[in-house]
């Protein structure tokens, strides 16, 4: 399971997710990717479930990159506890995702295989996503 080795503060406030992703919104490593279309929290368990679904489908071919990391702790109070007496203890970790963020990338497989692998991963995630394909000629990726 993904989580930070150590953090400066054990507990964080929830915060708001405003605007679109300005970083991590293009394909960096792979040929195909999965891009978030709406904001949300993705837990470490969901990331792992999506990764397992993809790697099982593509078997030994290809490589998968996980482009998000769960670095935000989410606290929870025990069941049947009265209100008050402080904030609960950290229960799990989430990655905060803005629309436009690339979540996963795949390379070394055909487009059909990549599409199906990312479709399987899509079903494990709590947000709407879309399939991305690297444009070889033209587009924003060519700089220079």
Swiss-Prot record:
SUPFAM superfamilies: Ribosomal protein L16p/L10e. GO terms for biological process: translation. One of its GO terms (molecular function) is tRNA binding. GO terms for cellular component: cytosolic large ribosomal subunit. Keywords: Ribonucleoprotein, Ribosomal protein, RNA-binding, rRNA-binding, tRNA-binding. Binds 23S rRNA and is also seen to make contacts with the A and possibly P site tRNAs. HAMAP family: Ribosomal_uL16. Part of the 50S ribosomal subunit. This is Large ribosomal subunit protein uL16. The gene is rplP.
């Amino acid at each position: 399971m993904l989580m930070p080795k150590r953090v400066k503060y054990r507990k964080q406030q929830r915060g708001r997710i405003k605007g679109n992703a300005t970083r991590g919104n293009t394909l960096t490593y792979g040929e195909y990717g999965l891009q978030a279309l709406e904001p949300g929290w993705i837990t470490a368990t969901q990331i792992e479930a999506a990764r397992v679904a993809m790697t099982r489908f593509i078997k030994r071919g290809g490589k998968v990159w996980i482009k998000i990391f769960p670095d935000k702790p989410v606290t929870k109070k025990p069941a049947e506890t009265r209100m008050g007496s402080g904030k609960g203890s950290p229960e799990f970790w989430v990655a905060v995702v803005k629309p436009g963020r690339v979540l996963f990338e795949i390379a070394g497989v055909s487009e059909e295989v990549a599409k199906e692998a990312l479709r399987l991963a899509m079903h494990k995630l709590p947000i709407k996503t879309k399939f991305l394909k690297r444009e070889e000629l033209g587009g924003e990726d060519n700089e220079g």
